[in-house]
């Protein structure tokens, strides 16, 4: 866990640290690698010690170990310290109204995350939790709009795009604009394992939304040169209360 320790001083300077946890974490599951991953809980604990507090759990490997794997990873995250926030796993449709929130320095942030697919493994009624797919735009719109009402800022993680490609596809651009229009302030893309471009989008209400289409890898065993180059997105979110009581967020 040397790499986590190396970045800890950087993370210590931030108020909030978010990461896409692309493998199931548990102390119960046997560790396994490609194509169906599971990771010892010590990995997540090392990230926690490094300063990570927000973990996105929605990606193409979420269903790798089926219902039993989901149950084990849910138990693991429930055992983590209370200041850990997870997003991207929902306990059925009745849970969709729950918006993960965190208030830091008087600023409330909502965290949502979605995935394009789960490697052909469908959601099953036997699963204790499920992801929300990017194709479920009606659900996503409801969540993002609700989050926009409840929080000062809405950060959305999206697991999308083409693996090992620096090219942003039309589906990414379309969904990014929709998310911005619905209320997202920051969109963090993952899945391609290589860097893709970033840009500002103008939302329907005039807000500016920042989207990083892919940050590449943080920690992996992939070894292509462009897979070894990842980015850490560092943003400043500012909330200003005017004398008349109105709040400006930027």
What kind of feature is each model-predicted range?
Residues 2-250:
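Acidic, metal/ion-coordinating pockets
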């Amino acid at each position: 866990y040397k790499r986590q320790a190396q970045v800890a001083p950087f993370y210590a300077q931030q108020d909030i640290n978010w990461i896409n946890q692309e493998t199931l974490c548990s102390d119960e599951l046997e560790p396994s690698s490609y194509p169906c991953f599971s990771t010892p809980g010590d990995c997540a604990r090392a990230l926690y010690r490094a300063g990570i507090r927000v973990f996105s759990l929605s990606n193409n490997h979420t269903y790798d170990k089926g219902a039993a794997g989901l149950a084990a990873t849910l138990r693991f995250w429930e055992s983590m310290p209370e200041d850990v926030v997870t997003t991207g796993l929902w306990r059925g449709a009745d849970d969709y109204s729950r918006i993960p929130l965190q208030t830091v320095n008087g600023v409330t942030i909502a965290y949502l995350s979605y995935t394009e697919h789960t490697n052909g493994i469908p959601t099953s009624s036997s699963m204790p939790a499920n992801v929300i797919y990017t194709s479920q735009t009606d659900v996503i719109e409801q969540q993002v709009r609700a989050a926009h009402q409840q929080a000062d800022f809405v950060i959305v993680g999206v697991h999308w795009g083409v693996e090992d490609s620096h090219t942003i596809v039309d589906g990414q651009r379309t969904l990014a604009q929709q998310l911005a229009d619905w209320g997202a302030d920051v969109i963090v893309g993952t899945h391609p394992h290589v860097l893709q471009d970033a840009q500002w989008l103008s939302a329907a209400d005039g807000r500016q939304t920042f989207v990083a289409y892919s940050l590449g890898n943080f920690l992996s065993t992939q070894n292509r040169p462009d897979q070894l180059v990842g980015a850490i997105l560092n943003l400043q979110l500012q909330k200003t209360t005017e004398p008349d009581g109105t709040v400006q967020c930027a």
